[in-house]
Amino acid sequence: MFNKDEIIVPKNLEEEMKESYLRYSMSVIISRALPDIRDGLKPSQRRVLYAMKQLSLSPGAKHRKCAKICGDTSGDYHPHGESVIYPTLVRMAQNWAMRYPLVDGQGNFGSIDGDPPAAMRYTEARLTHSAMYLMEDLDKDTVDIVPNYDETKHEPVVFPSKFPNLLCNGSSGIAVGMATNIPPHNLGELIEATLLLLANPQASVDEILQVMPGPDFPTGGIICGSEGIRSTYTTGRGKIKVRARLHVEENEDKHRESIIITEMPYNVNKSRLIEQIANLVNEKTLAGISDVRDESDKDGIRVVLEIKKGESSEIIINRLYKFTDVQVTFGANMLALDKNLPRTMSIHRMISAWIRHRKEVIRRRTRYELNKAETRAHVLEGYLKALSCLDALVKTIRESGNKEHAKERIIESFGFTEPQALAILELRLYQLTGLEAEKIQKEYEELLNKIAYYKQVLSDEGLVKDIIRNELQDLLKHHKVARRTTIEFDADDIRDIEDIITNESVIITISGDDYVKRMPVKVFKEQRRGGHGVTGFDMKKGAGFLKAVYSAFTKDYLLIFTNFGQCYWLKVWQLPEGERRAKGKPIINFLEGIRPGEELAAILNIKNFDNAGFLFLATKRGVVKKVSLDAFSNPRKKGIRALEIDEGDELIAACHIVSDEEKVMLFTHLGMAVRFPHEKVRPMGRTARGVRGVSLKNEEDKVVSCQIVTENQSVLIVCDQGFGKRSLVEDFRETNRGGVGVRSILINERNGNVLGAIPVTDHDSILLMSSQGQAIRINMQDVRVMGRSTQGVRLVHLKEGDALVSMEKLSSNENDDEVLSGSEEECSDTVSLR
């Protein structure tokens, strides 16, 4: 049945399905559903356009059958059925779907009523000028070219993209676990915004809104209010209210009015809207309408809604907005691939990413032109040298037996290089005349000037920006058109989003692969110590394990620190809300500038930055630093440096100091602890390295927790095998910073090693989570205070092979009636995730 040389590797079915689905998911995300930030195209769109370019279907060329285009695309670049490729081509030709169509279609390409296009054997197409701008300079080594799927041809991984196509035409797509919906914009306004960011990379959203007030949909319509636009531009997500453009006309008898719809909201099917209105008229929801007619023609849309005599057109219009798609919400989600990673991006970051791409294109184009110019200049140098010794050169060539012999002789006799010798041998006699010699000299001098300019461009960032600026201004001069969508500002829509957010206590969880979510704290019932807990995280979602859990309020500020010592700033409500078993969303979608290998180390929630005290940072090798919290009040989007990290070290904790009475406690993996006043560490600058906080016992030891404590507190110390204890802070004698410290808990096979420690009172609860997703919330009244060197008690029963990975203190909330105390028996329905 099997060959003797075959090797069969047994695999767990569940693990194989999980890994295979993850690979499939990433394939859909990267290779199918999401556009590239650089050229705004999905792979299928890019391949269709490239196949059309290979067929020389430029704007001035004759249209070719779509069947030919789809066949070539399928056979050469996109190994899928032509019936899958044809809809991609059709959409790029529909002027109600694309703000700037990339394909010039001839024939029936569908309609805004949802009519299907004709079969591809009947329709024809060619490229538009917009598509040509995307592919301009493709032959000048401006982008990477890779083999196609069967390595018989080559295709570009991205287009040079002379304009920001992603924001011009927008994009929509559904991947696995994520979706994109980017609105289109006006090219002229977008160029103005790009020029603004070229001149001032730190320009604010308000400054961008002054030159680009919002999306510009191909179907026109009206955008109501600016808050949805502002949210979209700031966070990458927003809800934009879009209405049809309509007006009221008086009928000829002057006793009745008609509502006339002339422009549709984006992505609204006109025939379905008419059907929707007609159904509501029959149901008496829109009883004031007597007739619905579609009078649209080649000159434009005209939907007529006749109003009954005596009815108010204003009331009917408001009911149309409420009950029909005359008003819709465009849910913007500016998700695209940036460096092959899906990211939700602000307008600033999207434009900046295109500028970054364009800079690289210009540098590569300049290097190509430089190499070409230097090669030609080298040949011309040979020509000029040949003209200076023409008679001897001709004599040498005539005396040679063949071309190869002549090449060798002139190289040896006159010192020409091989490329120069070959070029001289291919010269025609008329090129040796005096007039041609002058042309050669002139061309050589021009090339020297070009070479100097190209080298200057490659060494001067300012010149690269000037080239981008000049190219954009040229596009603006020839392609600036009036916007189709108008924006009406509604005072009711312009309000702070936090006014409608409840400031409730939430739990923030971070999975092993850095997926984040927030949950109301009330989803976890309190249990007595030793309980089995409830499922706080679903391992079947593919997250691997739970890395961390934090508590906060929805309106708090989050300072997010990474192991590289970088700090990012977020509001809690910006994180996605999920159920207990939900996986959440990638934290990378919310943080810009995350580098390979960079992981979350600590999250600190801050109410405000007024008189906020100090931030205390600690690394796993025992280095500590104190810095004013005010230094972190306005981090940049790509984060700011919080601590200079030594090689082999990493940041593990960040704490908030608010009073002089507070002390610092450092706990180590092998059960040691040190306590000292925070005044022992002087305030430092944000980028300083820090000082020694604790001396570790050996190379296996490391700092696992840094806490700020007061004298009247106790400390809960938790080991990874589910055991722990409470000890009084005063039991840990105060020492100088940098010492080895004292024993905090006995380390043995039963307890395992120290996971962490948190200062607590009887009014606090603790939330423990294991690597297999088990969660338990324990009231501190159920854990008695013990001596410093004791073993502790069981806090949670863990399944075999499981271990605690995270702990977080939950302050009591008297208003939360749903946080109940329960017994161990009440939690017997814990789901097994093994």
UniProtKB/Swiss-Prot annotation:
Few gyrases are as efficient as E.coli at forming negative supercoils. Not all organisms have 2 type II topoisomerases; in organisms with a single type II topoisomerase this enzyme also has to decatenate newly replicated chromosomes. Signal peptide: none annotated. Its main location: cytoplasm. One of its GO terms (cellular component) is cytoplasm. It catalyses: ATP-dependent breakage, passage and rejoining of double-stranded DNA. Belongs to the type II topoisomerase GyrA/ParC subunit family. Its EC number is 5.6.2.2. Heterotetramer, composed of two GyrA and two GyrB chains. In the heterotetramer, GyrA contains the active site tyrosine that forms a transient covalent intermediate with DNA, while GyrB binds cofactors and catalyzes ATP hydrolysis. SUPFAM superfamilies: GyrA/ParC C-terminal domain-like, Type II DNA topoisomerase. The active site is at Y122 (o-(5'-phospho-dna)-tyrosine intermediate). One of its GO terms (biological process) is DNA-templated DNA replication. GO terms for molecular function: ATP binding; DNA binding; DNA negative supercoiling activity. This is DNA gyrase subunit A. It comes from Chlamydia pneumoniae (Chlamydophila pneumoniae). The keyword DNA-binding applies. Keywords: ATP-binding, Cytoplasm, DNA-binding, Isomerase, Nucleotide-binding, Topoisomerase.
